[in-house]
């Protein structure tokens, strides 16, 4: 997958050639099963039309600019989102910088600048409830109104239902709700994978060693979505170049919360991972923590 960081025709041609594109647009936070269903349709339609498949997304969640006080926590960081998008087989992702100026752009201008001028759009595939542009004024009908005079088609898709039969469509909001309740399995059912967090091990207070359970204090970006406080069964991969262990994955017990034994009044959740069968020093190493099951809530011991 090519990553394009400028919404210009020159940048797009350099990445995927002078060809037309079938496009989908969105925040794509989590790259969940609903997103993957849309991208599969984009790829299929692009192949049928002899075009390239492209995801148009943003360098930050639009809500973090438009309404920062209520912006959702993210299911994926920027790097993980690109990795997951690449795994769908899409030809390219255009990452549009999102700032106050972008937030104020009229939907018609966005379509002309990004889709028509930069991407030479041949088709647009989005959810039937898709909105975009200034004050979310753009929608499927606006795309259809513009399509006739600009030679592209619009194919709206319905929401993807959950595989477990629950009457709730797959969405980033539903996944965040599941995580907030500690239901990492329900989140995984909608993500199509287990939820994960990445971070660097900080110094912590090392008091866990005094009670026989040395833990790694993983510093996770504050913008990311943490599951509910509690203890989880997890798998932890050491991503950094620690000798003899880089790339190795361990079973782990992960505690999310205020560490009630030592920090009853902590102001924010902390992530501590105890890697089974690992006794080395993890300080300053980058870890990937994958949540498999909720074990119990926090309790002081």
Where are these regions (language model features)?
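General small-molecule cofactor/ligand-binding pocket signal
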Residues: 2-4, 93-96, 153-157
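Residue-level signal for inorganic ion chemistry
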Residues: 32, 85, 124, 187, ...
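Conserved beta-strand elements of the Class I
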Residues: 21-23, 54
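Positively charged, low-complexity intrinsically disordered leader regions
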Residues: 1-21
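Phosphate/ribose-recognition catalytic cores of enzymes acting on nucleotide-derived substrates
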Residues: 150, 204-301
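Short, glycine-rich nucleotide/cofactor-binding loops
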Residues: 24-36
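Core alpha/beta nucleotide-donor-binding catalytic domains of modification enzymes
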Residues: 36-119, 126
